[in-house]
């Protein structure tokens, strides 16, 4: 079995909707444009089940923690317990400072890169050995810009306009992760280690 639970990290509230820290939530908006996701409240967040994911026979759950970023682990831990999901069946989609906008990176385990949402998940699960899909948001334009303020700043209009294409380009990877068994994932890790999906110059 591949990925069973996909978590999209972000902050609830209208003031955070288009901020860089909410890149995963913005991506989710454009991942499944042709279906209405059956969201319901649960596991300290919004959770939805998709049967026959992207035409496969697999079932996958989607989770948007509503605990705010720094407490994401409380929601993820509750969902993993409810679904009996282990770390190897968990994919966390999150913003990544070290990648430029338009670049995504698939990773399993490893360091947390100072990301408070990932840190919270590790603290609750007791392991960092879960999958991550890192969505590039780029670094601040100047070293004088505070990182905390930067990740809570809004995307530029050109970046916002690119999210539909970013969502379409990412959907294929998510489908492969859901239907691919653990033994075959090394190929995906290699292909998606650092992949540019779009350029704002296009």
Swiss-Prot record:
Superkingdom as given in the UniProt entry: Bacteria
One Pfam family cited in the UniProt record for this chain: Pept_tRNA_hydro
Keyword list, A-Z: Cytoplasm, Hydrolase, RNA-binding, tRNA-binding
Compartment(s) of residence: Cytoplasm
Residues annotated as transmembrane: none
GO cellular component: cytoplasm
Binding sites annotated in the UniProt record for tRNA: 16, 68, 70, 116
Function: Hydrolyzes ribosome-free peptidyl-tRNAs (with 1 or more amino acids incorporated), which drop off the ribosome during protein synthesis, or as a result of ribosome stalling.
Alphabetized NCBIfam families for the sequence: pth
Subunit structure: Monomer.
Listed name of the protein: Peptidyl-tRNA hydrolase
Source organism of this protein record: Treponema pallidum (strain Nichols)
Source lineage: Bacteria, Pseudomonadati, Spirochaetota, Spirochaetia, Spirochaetales
Gene this protein is translated from: pth
């Amino acid at each position: 079995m591949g990925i069973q639970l996909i978590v999209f990290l972000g902050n609830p509230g209208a003031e955070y909707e288009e901020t860089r820290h909410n890149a995963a939530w913005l991506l989710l908006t454009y991942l499944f444009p042709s279906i209405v996701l059956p969201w319901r409240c649960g596991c300290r967040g919004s959770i939805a089940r998709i049967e026959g994911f992207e035409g496969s026979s697999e079932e996958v759950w989607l989770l948007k923690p509503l605990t705010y970023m720094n407490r994401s682990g409380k929601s993820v831990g509750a969902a993993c317990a409810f679904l009996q999901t282990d770390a190897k069946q968990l994919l966390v989609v999150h913003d990544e400072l070290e990648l430029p906008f338009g670049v995504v990176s698939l990773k399993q385990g490893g360091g947390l890169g100072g990301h408070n949402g990932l840190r919270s998940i590790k603290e609750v699960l007791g392991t960092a050995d879960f999958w991550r899909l890192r969505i590039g948001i780029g670094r601040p334009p100047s070293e004088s810009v505070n990182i905390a303020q930067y990740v809570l700043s809004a995307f530029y209009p050109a970046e916002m306009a690119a999210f539909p294409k970013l969502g379409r380009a990412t959907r294929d990877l998510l489908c492969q992760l859901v239907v691919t068994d653990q033994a075959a994932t090394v190929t995906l890790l290699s292909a998606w280690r650092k992949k540019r999906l779009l350029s704002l110059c296009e």
